[in-house]
Amino acid sequence: MSTVYFDVSADGQKLGKITFKLYDDVVPKTAENFRALCTGEKGFGYKGSIFHRVIPQFMLQGGDFTNFNGTGGKSIYGTKFADENFVKRHDRPGLLSMANAGPNTNGSQFFITTVPCPWLDGKHVVFGEVTDGLDIVKKIESFGSGSGATSKKIVIEESGQL
């Protein structure tokens, strides 16, 4: 299984590292997209992008590295790709899942759950989990709001593969 990371800041202050294990064995295409966007090896990716939507007791959303507001992003396969499968469930905090605009519209946007989210099962593809830095996830969560607007600018300063 691939291991990737984000080094995250809030308003320029370093928060720390979030490490993820990707489910290459269950959703290889989805995991490979995220891995390659973490390394930036295709010439684009997550480095320098933001968490544009953070809702406490729900999730942290990021991955729009083209428009930085939730309307953009792209996958390594082109703009969008199909839902691979829904084997993994949104059954706990710290899960990595694809954000989308309906069936088969995966790009680069993702979210990290902060609570179990069973209503998302069968609609969003879970492709990894936080293995280290859940405290950083909780810190980012504290900068969110009910509307999703963040009180601080949350930036992925560095990302890559370990």
From Swiss-Prot:
Catalyzed reactions: [protein]-peptidylproline (omega=180) = [protein]-peptidylproline (omega=0)
EC number: 5.2.1.8
PPIase cyclophilin-type domain location: 5-161
Protein name: Peptidyl-prolyl cis-trans isomerase
MF (Gene Ontology): cyclosporin A binding; peptidyl-prolyl cis-trans isomerase activity
Enzyme class: isomerase
PANTHER family, alphabetized: PEPTIDYL-PROLYL CIS-TRANS ISOMERASE, PEPTIDYL-PROLYL CIS-TRANS ISOMERASE D-RELATED
Any GO BP: negative regulation of meiotic nuclear division
A Pfam family per the record: Pro_isomerase
Physiological role: PPIases accelerate the folding of proteins. It catalyzes the cis-trans isomerization of proline imidic peptide bonds in oligopeptides.
Notes on how activity is controlled: Binds cyclosporin A (CsA). CsA mediates some of its effects via an inhibitory action on PPIase.
Domain of life according to the entry: Eukaryota
Keywords (A to Z) from UniProt: Cytoplasm, Isomerase, Rotamase
Protein family according to the UniProt entry: Belongs to the cyclophilin-type PPIase family. PPIase A subfamily.
Subcellular location: Cytoplasm
Claim: Isomerase is one of the keywords in the record: yes
Cellular component aspect of the GO annotation: cytoplasm; fungal biofilm matrix; mitochondrial intermembrane space; Set3 complex; yeast-form cell wall
